[in-house]
Amino acid sequence: GTYALYSDDTEVILTATRNGLSNDSENPADWNGEANATKKDGPQVTYYRSLIYATPSPYGKELAAKVNAGEKLTWEDLDKATWAVQKTSSSAGYIYPTLWLMENYDGKKISDLSNVVPLDSGYGTAFSYAAAEQVDIIVCYADGRNDYEASWTLPVDQKDETGKQGMGRSESIWNELNVIGVTDGIYNDTVAISKESPYYTPELIDALQQCFINIINTDEGQAIFSVYSHTGYAIAKDSDYDGARAALEVVS
């Protein structure tokens, strides 16, 4: 959102890329089931998404069954559910799920839902609430299930190799935690220039873009930019960040 905030004075020329996922479908049903388990082996991408998940609670299963049958959920369906969300400043955990609601349900927001549990302790808490069936819906970056796949089925008195506490479920997270909504892309970091400077000619901008792309495609460049977790750069345009501008409106 930083570029969107200052885009009156700056011009984006590049977007950082990251390793993408095997799935980028906008159809939530395409994300569900063991056969559709997401892998971290996709192409380089300039954005990531947030996903809205139905938990294995009795009502969460009802929501998942509707989506997997090709039905569109109504506002009443969603409003009946208990949601766990992250802080209001979280892009994947609050802002973009709010935008998803606004776009699909006549401007309704998370703040309009009847049953919302705000979480201050991160996504791990959301997944533990889901596993315990304490809530019906959680929201998280795509695809958070990768990071909790092992701990989901571990006994609660054990930890996985990354230190995550077991959640005691018996079925695969891919079968039990179903995607019911997919947000628009949340764009990555930018390389931007000042609109005020007279030095940025089209020729110089082209040269800068190619320079960054060439550098990061070397081993030395990867090492330099690893501090920012950037693995590549792609040429960007201002309209890529329209969603980020809409997000600013949500939190303003």
Regions flagged by a language model, labelled:
Residues G1-I13, G20-W31, T125, R145-S151:
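Pocket-flanking alpha-helical
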Residues G1-T2, L51-Y53, Q134-I137:
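Hydrophobic, aliphatic-enriched repeat segments that assemble into extended interaction scaffolds
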Residues A4-Y6, P56, V85-K87, N104-Y105, ...:
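Sec/Tat-exported extracytoplasmic proteins
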Residues L5-D8, Y96, W100, G122-T125, ...:
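Extracytoplasmic/secreted proteins, especially bacterial periplasmic and envelope-associated proteins
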Residues I13-T15, V139-C140:
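Short beta-strand and adjacent tight-turn residues that come in two discontinuous sequence segments
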Residues T15-S91:
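A conserved helix-loop-strand patch within extracytoplasmic ligand-binding domains
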Residues V67, E71, D79-T201:
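Pocket-lining segment of extracytoplasmic ligand-binding domains
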Residues N104, Y199-S252:
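An extracytoplasmic/periplasmic, membrane-proximal ligand-sensing/linker region
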